[in-house]
UniProtKB/Swiss-Prot annotation:
This is Aquaporin PIP2-7. The modification N-acetylmethionine is found at M1. It comes from Arabidopsis thaliana. It holds the Pfam family MIP. Induction: By NaCl and abscisic acid (ABA) treatments. PANTHER family: AQUAPORIN OR AQUAGLYCEROPORIN RELATED. The chain crosses the membrane at residues 39-59, 70-90, 119-139, 161-181, 193-213, 243-263. A motif (NPA 2) lies at residues 221-223. The modification Phosphothreonine is found at T279. One of its GO terms (cellular component) is plasma membrane.
Amino acid sequence: MSKEVSEEGKTHHGKDYVDPPPAPLLDMGELKSWSFYRALIAEFIATLLFLYVTVATVIGHKKQTGPCDGVGLLGIAWAFGGMIFVLVYCTAGISGGHINPAVTFGLFLARKVSLVRALGYMIAQCLGAICGVGFVKAFMKTPYNTLGGGANTVADGYSKGTALGAEIIGTFVLVYTVFSATDPKRSARDSHIPVLAPLPIGFAVFMVHLATIPITGTGINPARSFGAAVIYNNEKAWDDQWIFWVGPFLGALAAAAYHQYILRASAIKALGSFRSNATN
């Protein structure tokens, strides 16, 4: 997209931002870089902290018996959204602040990260999630074991198809927000206000939780669902686990395609470039 400025009868064409080059599909050189392993550590710790705070909030809420006790659904949604805001702000400059395999998958499809980095991030995120929920169980063992362990399952009264649809749409909202908040044009314009990228991402997580907690407990993050399932180790949590991988990955795929090929018209630009080269 070009920026046109007319001044004194002259028209100047030029971008006020630079599109980063696409990441290589397979960059084995990253395995020799300390910055790659530093990013893996950042993703591991961020996901650990995310799961610890959020699952502890869920268990603490369920532990209360009075109708006005605990933080309620609104407080749980704030815990998830608020932690994403904080952790993305803290880690964006190191790893990009993904904290979610679905986000990593979407960015990989858009050629923002290489396959090596994407796989490394997903492994680090899942391990961090397991450790984070493990800390919750260690500190709150009795309520953790009796109150669902913070695991994602399909709620009574909802079909698996409905739950899958909720996860697809919820993850679409999140990943679409990530693409929009980190768009090079927006980043160039808002670079003097560093909180403007993490804020809408955290708020998107908050809003999606309000909508989907009654259906699935809100996954939209395969690492979050996997970590809780591993530590809680409940049959229903494992039976429903596929929903919290397939749904988020399909949602991320749809968001990446929508942003890259419709909003940013990457396919049309590539076709135009091909035609231009063919005529020269």
